[in-house]
C-alpha cells in the first residue's frame, strides 16, 4: 500500500525508533497469510479494488519483477505486496546502475494482470497522488536509507531523479486503466 505518514504522528515511537512524515510503501506483519503468484488475487474481497490500483502503480513506477502477493486470511483476503528485491532496472537482477536507470527512465512497465474491476475513484486518486509526489517527498524517503546499506549517495541521487521523472508518466498509465 502507498500512503503518506502525516506530520501529526511523526516522532519517536520507541527509544531510538522514529517515524517521519513522508510517502511510504509497506506491508503489515501478517500472522495468518498465504502467498499467491503471479496474478493479483481476490479483487472482489476487502478493499482490494482500491489496493490493487496502488500495486499497479508500484509495479510500473519501480519496474517490478517476480510478483509476490500476500493474502491476509484473517482480513477478508486483503492483498499486500512484498519482496521487492528484484525491482528496478535491470529487472530481475537485484541491483541497479545509473546507466540502467537512465536508459529505462521512460520505459513503460505495466503490471501484466487484467485491470478489470479496479475502482475508478482509486484509479484517479492513485494518479493524483503520483502527480503530487515532490522532490522533497522523494528525498525524505531516500534519506532514511541506513548508512550501513551498500548504496552510495550518488546512487540514491540517481534513483531519486529516476523516481521523480517516472512518476507523471506512470500516473498517466494508471489513468488508462480506467478504460480497460
Protein language model regions, located:
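Short amphipathic alpha-helical segments and their helix-coil junctions
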Residues: 31-40, 144
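Short alpha-helical "patches" and their helix-cap loops
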Residues: 2-4, 68-76, 176-180
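A generic structural signal for short, non-catalytic loop/turn and secondary-structure boundary residues
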Residues: 12-14, 74, 156
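Conserved kinase catalytic-core segment
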Residues: 36-93
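C-terminal catalytic region of ATP-dependent kinase domains
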Residues: 78-180
Amino acid at each position: 500500500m502507498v500512503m503518506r505518514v502525516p506530520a501529526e504522528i511523526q516522532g519517536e515511537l520507541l527509544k531510538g525508533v522514529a517515524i517521519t512524515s513522508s510517502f511510504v510503501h509497506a506491508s503489515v506483519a501478517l500472522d495468518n497469510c498465504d502467498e499467491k503468484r503471479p496474478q493479483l488475487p481476490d479483487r472482489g474481497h476487502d478493499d482490494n479494488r482500491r489496493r490493487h490500483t496502488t500495486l499497479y502503480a508500484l509495479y510500473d513506477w519501480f519496474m517490478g519483477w517476480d510478483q509476490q502477493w500476500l493474502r491476509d486470511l484473517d482480513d477478508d483476503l486483503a492483498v499486500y505486496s512484498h519482496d521487492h528485491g528484484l525491482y528496478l532496472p535491470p529487472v530481475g537482477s537485484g541491483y541497479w546502475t545509473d546507466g540502467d536507470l537512465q536508459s529505462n527512465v521512460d520505459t513503460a512497465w505495466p503490471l501484466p494482470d487484467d485491470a478489470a474491476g479496479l475502482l475508478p475513484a482509486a484509479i484517479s486518486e492513485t494518479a493524483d497522488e503520483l502527480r503530487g509526489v515532490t522532490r522533497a517527498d522523494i528525498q525524505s524517503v531516500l534519506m532514511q536509507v541506513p548508512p550501513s546499506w551498500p548504496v552510495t549517495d550518488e546512487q540514491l541521487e540517481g534513483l531519486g531523479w529516476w523516481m521523480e521523472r517516472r512518476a507523471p508518466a506512470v500516473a498517466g498509465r494508471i489513468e488508462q486503466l480506467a478504460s480497460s
